[in-house]
Each structure stands twice: as C-alpha cells, then as structure tokens.
Design a protein with these regions (language model features):
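Membrane-helix cytosolic exit motif
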Residues: 18, 254-266, 270, 327, ...
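Alpha-helical transmembrane segments and their immediate juxtamembrane interface regions
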Residues: 81-99, 322-361
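"…together with the soluble PPM/PP2C metallo-phosphatase catalytic core" -> "…together
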Residues: 1-257
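Membrane-interface starts of transmembrane alpha-helices
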Residues: 99-102, 136, 215, 300-311, ...
Length: 361
C-alpha cells in the first residue's frame, strides 16, 4: 500500500509542477499542432505526462530499495529496462524528430533487457506447433521483443482522447493484479499496483479537462509495462492461459491489426501514416460531435473530447472481463477473443454507417 501511495502522489505532484510551469517549457513540450487527422484538442497542451509516470516508478523503486522492501530489485530492473522505450518516446514528444521505427526498435531493446534480467520471454501461446517453435531460444526472444514493441505501439495508437489509453491500461493492470493475486504471485501483483498508482496520478490531470497529455513517452512506457507483466504472469504461472494475455490486451491489439488491414488492403495506403478512421476517432466525429455540436468554446470542446473515452473503456472491458473470469480456460478465452472481434467489427461498421445500436448511445 505504501508503494501504491508513493507512486500515486509522486506522479500527481510532479505532473502538477509540469502543468503549473508549462510556460517555461511549452516551446518544446507542448502539442501545438491542432490540424492533424488525429488531433482533437483546441489549445496547446504539454504532452510529457509520461515524465511524471516514469518519475513515480523510479522514486518508488528507489524508496523500496532504501527500505529493502520485497521486489524492489524487480521494480528497479523493470524501470531501468523501460529506459530505451521511454527516452525515445519522450524525445519524440520534445523534438518531433524520432520516427516510429526508431521508437519501436527502442521498445524492442527494452523488451530484450527485461527478458534478460527478469526472464520475461514468451515460451507458449497454447498452440502446439507454435509452442514447439518458441522452445527455440532465438525465436522466443525475437517474438517477445516484437510482441512487446507492438503492444507499446498499440497503446500509442489508442492514445487519442483524454483518459482513453490511461484508463484502459489501469483496467488491464487491475486484471493482471487480480489474476496474480489468485495464483499468489506477489511480485506481479506489486509491479502492477505500482504502475496503477503512477497512471492514476496522471489520470487526474488528464481527465476530463485534458491539462496534460500522455505523449509517446508515456504511451510506450505504459504499453511496455503491461506487455512485460502479462508475459511474466503467464511464464511464471502454468495455470494462467496465454490467451489471458491476449484478451486482456485485445482492444489495443485488434485496433492496431484492424488499422493495418484497413489501410493496406482496403485503402491501399501506407499503414504507418496517421489518419482519422480509428474507432475512437469515428465515435468522436459521428457520435459525440453530432450529439453535442462542434461550435463550442475550448473548455466545452475539451469536455466533449473526454466523452469519447468511456465508450472505449466499455469496449475494452468486453474482452477484459472474460479474461478475468476464465483466466485458466484457454478454449473459453479463444472463443471470447472471437466474440470480441465480431463485436468490434459490428460496432465499427455501425458507427461508419451512422447506425449505432441503441445500447451504444
């Protein structure tokens, strides 16, 4: 509990200072581009919320080390492992000059470091032929780095509205913490709760008023952390199905895969370029703006931005709740994954055609 509170208040207070003194750093830290296809804010806002989250993790880790608390070593190792992903992400936030490929490579390096020091490798996914391939160390290492980097990028993709990516990460981490508690894996429980505290400190300033954004540094850090913890939970506990890891991250994973398919196959475009057809973008444009109007004052527009996120929180819960209920039943989890995909596609098509179901209003 002490680590949770320390993480929360460190994040909360450090981000308060970032916001309070933004006039000193806004020339570098503020997101002033209001015209891009994925830009839905109406004023210049600092996008270095990830700095507060990282500081919270680092301070909590150092405090745990000084007090010789349990799992302080693992916490500090995970924080240090996250450095390449976080530093490249926040450098992009400050300079706008770090390409997506470099950020992905940095996150893959972070995954490799975490895998080496914490033995966080993907060795099974519950499919016989693939599990045999993953028994080969080089394949396991490569797949782990790819998966963690992909999930971190997925969190960056869904980070489009106030509170969206941060709350989905909190929900996913609480699911991980619950299953860790069920299997008595206190290390995973501790690492998940510490990150929940750090994100919660950021969330208070981000939602609903959007006083600060997560930024690439924050999104990659959170995605990396969630990815490594799901891998550790499965690899350390044979009772936990690998499909729990898939379902608990189903929304960001499928949003990314669906985006790649939509751009490459359906539209014939470069999948790496930003566009305005993400599910969260469509909900905002075709539901929120239609319901509340678009000719609003900046403060009202910021609140409208925030009204988008709860829809996606509910959608992500469609996969996370079954993951929590049936975390050791792989076939049920596979079926739930298919059901989630079907629901996602049906809802996406409905919103595109302005025919949203009544329960989605």
């Amino acid at each position: 509990m002490s680590s949770l509170l320390l993480s929360f208040f460190t994040s909360l207070i450090s981000i308060l200072f970032v916001i309070r003194y933004q006039h000193l750093h806004s020339a570098w830290s503020a997101d002033s581009d209001l015209s891009g296809p994925q830009k839905f804010h109406t004023a210049s806002v600092p996008r270095i919320g990830g700095l507060g989250i990282f500081l919270a993790l680092l301070v909590t880790g150092l405090a745990a080390w000084l007090q010789s608390l349990s799992y302080q070593r693992e916490l500090l190792l995970l924080v240090l492992s996250a450095l390449p992903a976080f530093l490249l992400g926040i450098t992009e936030d400050l300079t706008k000059r770090i390409g997506a490929g470099i950020r992905l490579l940095g996150t893959a390096i972070s995954a490799g470091i975490a895998g080496y020091f914490l033995n966080a490798w993907i060795t099974r996914i519950g499919i016989a032929g693939i599990d045999q391939a993953l028994a080969i160390q080089a394949i396991s290492i490569g797949f782990t780095c790819f998966a963690v980097a992909g999930l971190a990028n997925a969190y960056n993709i869904i980070d489009g509205f106030n509170g969206l990516a941060s709350m989905i990460a909190i929900i996913a981490l609480l699911a991980i913490a619950y299953v860790a508690f069920q299997v008595q894996d206190k290390m995973i429980l501790y690492l998940a709760v510490v990150m929940v505290g750090a994100i919660a400190g950021f969330f208070i300033w981000n939602y609903p008023r959007g006083l600060i954004f997560l930024g690439d540094g924050g999104a990659y850090l959170i995605g990396f952390w969630v990815g490594v913890l799901t891998i550790l939970l499965v690899s350390r506990n044979s009772l936990v199905s690998p499909w729990f890891a898939v379902l608990v991250n189903a929304y960001p994973i499928f949003e990314t895969l669906f985006t790649i398919w939509r751009r490459m196959v359906h539209q014939g475009k470069n999948p790496g370029l930003p566009d305005g057809a993400h599910f969260h973008s469509l909900i905002y444009r075709r539901m929120i703006k239609w319901a509340y109007g678009s000719d609003l004052l900046p403060a009202q527009e910021a609140l409208n931005n925030s009204k988008t996120s709860p829809y996606l929180w509910v959608i992500s819960s469609i996969s996370i709740i079954p993951a929590v209920l049936w975390w050791k039943r792989p076939f049920v989890l596979m079926l739930c994954a298919l059901i989630f995909i079907a629901i996602y596609i049906a809802l996406y098509r409905s919103v595109v055609r302005f025919k949203k179901p009544s329960w989605f209003k």
